[in-house]
């Protein structure tokens, strides 16, 4: 969250709501009935954590309202009734959800005006383009969205229920094979951090497995909050490999490269060249080192041989949706 025209968001926090597991244990702590974002994160030991957004779509409105309240009053410190609001939504978001979102904004927060933009379109704006295909992969869902002259082409949008949370779960599982045990919600957050700091995408998965089989040099260590050291080797690239081979976690879907390709093939033949030349990666799950090269490699194998392919991942890809929103909201034509 932040203000239009800024080049980076003012507030970034996970969309989590935590409620105390035990009430009134700590007398005089002034315990709240719910904690949001980083505060929930830091007190996760005594809380039950809930994610109101599942697979990119809101399914718990009470918690979502708490998150918005926290955003306005605690993070940005603004009165929502004074400013227009730009919200974003997942592609193919059900109409009922959009209506509910609008209702809460107008009735609970009394905003004077609002607009709901599609996340992928904003990512494309942030990369300075109006035509291209966006592969947007966050925590709960991955989408491929072809966009032509600023308009998303709904018939060609594809959705893959495979994203950051699944990668974290998979890493938890393969770390168990190593003899480490991570099970609780609090421990999942630790594994997520391991993933964000150490994981990378192999250019050639099979070859990388061979290389790391015998070598200790591929291993990296990570210190847990209690001082214990975890060593991880091949797990570093086995984790994000799931994006290219969902079968590793027993999913029947095809990988992100094939999904993107299918998305392009659903588009009019005349615009495909423009899409192949402007593949934009966005969202937290596209931040792995090596993902751009691997994507280019896999994509070149699928596409016609004469096609010029360009895959770009803006450095701030985790925030590119927000940055695109900041650009859009600060245009004078938009404000009217």
Curated annotation (Swiss-Prot):
The record's section on Gene3D superfamilies has: 3.30.420.40, Actin, Chain A, domain 4 (3.90.640.10)
Asked if the record carries the keyword ATP-binding, the reply is yes
Q: Which domain of life is it from?
A: Eukaryota
Q: Which SUPFAM superfamilies match?
A: Actin-like ATPase domain (SSF53067)
Enzymatic reactions: ATP + H2O = ADP + phosphate + H(+)
Instruction: Report whether Cytoplasm shows up as a keyword of the record.
Output: yes
Which EC number(s) does the record attach to this protein? 3.6.4.-
What role does this protein play? Actins are highly conserved proteins that are involved in various types of cell motility and are ubiquitously expressed in all eukaryotic cells. Essential component of cell cytoskeleton; plays an important role in cytoplasmic streaming, cell shape determination, cell division, organelle movement and extension growth.
Miscellaneous: There are at least 5 different actin genes in tomato.
* Name recorded for this polypeptide: Actin-105
